[in-house]
Amino acid sequence: MTHAVAASPPSTRHLVGWSGKARRFGQSLHLREDELHDLLLQAPEVIAENLLWIGAQIKTGNGRKLDLLGLTRCGALIVIEVRRSENAAEALAAAIIHQQWARSLSIHDLIGHYEEFCGGQLLVDFYNAFADAIELSGNVTLCVVAPDVRRIAASIAALDASGIGAFGVEFE
């Protein structure tokens, strides 16, 4: 999956997709990390089309918390790590750790996280959103949201080339 390229003035946000391409997303943001979480929760299409949020601030069992976890229509999980500070490399390292944890999740685990997150019934809500049953693909894609994602573009491209789906969302 690739994203279209568009000219972008310096004050815009960019989405760096699987292909390493960038597209204009929006205006300059001066938000706290929790506000970025809220923005992403309200606009999941920034991360992926047909995305259902499974949870936020999920305890992963290794003393860390995963910022956001989404499930695509095709059954792939997306691990989102958000950093307000200019340290995308740190966010990428955390996302890789979370990816390993996410790979071990069963459908029952996802149901539990979803119920804790929004009180909904995952199987019903997924069907209502996508008119389909959940079939986990086993794929887990990494997403880093940080102001300096371009600094780690080579690392993201290397992960993607090795078969680990990865992309970033950059903002000012």
Label every PLM stretch briefly:
Residues 1-172:
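Charged, terminal alpha-helix-loop-beta segments
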